[in-house]
UniProtKB/Swiss-Prot annotation:
Protein name: UPF0306 protein YhbP
Residue intervals passing through the bilayer: none
Protein family per UniProt: Belongs to the UPF0306 family.
InterPro entries: Split_barrel_FMN-bd, UPF0306
Protein species of origin: Escherichia coli O17:K52:H18 (strain UMN026 / ExPEC)
Length: 147
């Protein structure tokens, strides 16, 4: 099974991402519902600019984060660790992402928060359902996939 396909399939079934941002030695993490775009390998989220994590991000920043389920046994652990870049979307790019986000989360129509993109550059997917400690790695720039 192709690594990115397996990762994308799993991410499409989840809905909460945690990401962390750093500014001048200070770290902060946040959680949000996300829409995953498998073609761009990116999450789309809504978050207000006044939040601590948005203030630390500025218009764009490096991030790292996770998406994980809540299994009751170690054998069922599945999750993603990633690094990438967050940026606030503007104009048509923002409008298109918001429409797609609103289709997945209709309640978001009530929110005026800006749309942000978290572009993933490296993904490590742990899937213990394929065997304890099974890891798959995807890297954007090298096209490398490791199983």
């Amino acid at each position: 099974m192709e690594t990115l396909t397996a990762i994308s399939r799993w991410l499409a079934k989840q809905h909460v991402v945690t990401w962390c941002v750093q500014q001048e030695g200070e770290l902060w993490c946040a959680n949000a519902f996300y829409l995953f775009d498998a073609q761009k390998v990116a999450f789309y989220i809504l978050t207000e600019e006044k939040t601590r994590h948005a203030q630390m991000s500025g218009p764009q920043a490096a991030v790292a984060g996770t998406v994980n389920g809540q299994p009751k046994t170690v054998a069922l652990i599945r999750g993603v660790q990633f690094k990438g870049e967050i940026r606030r979307l503007e104009g048509e790019e923002s409008d298109l992402a918001r429409k797609a986000y609103n289709r997945r989360f209709p309640v978001a129509r009530m929110l005026s928060a800006p749309v942000w993109e978290i572009r993933l550059d490296e993904i490590k997917f742990t899937d213990n359902t394929l065997g304890f400690g099974k890891k798959m790695i995807w890297l954007r720039n090298s096209g490398t996939e490791q199983a």
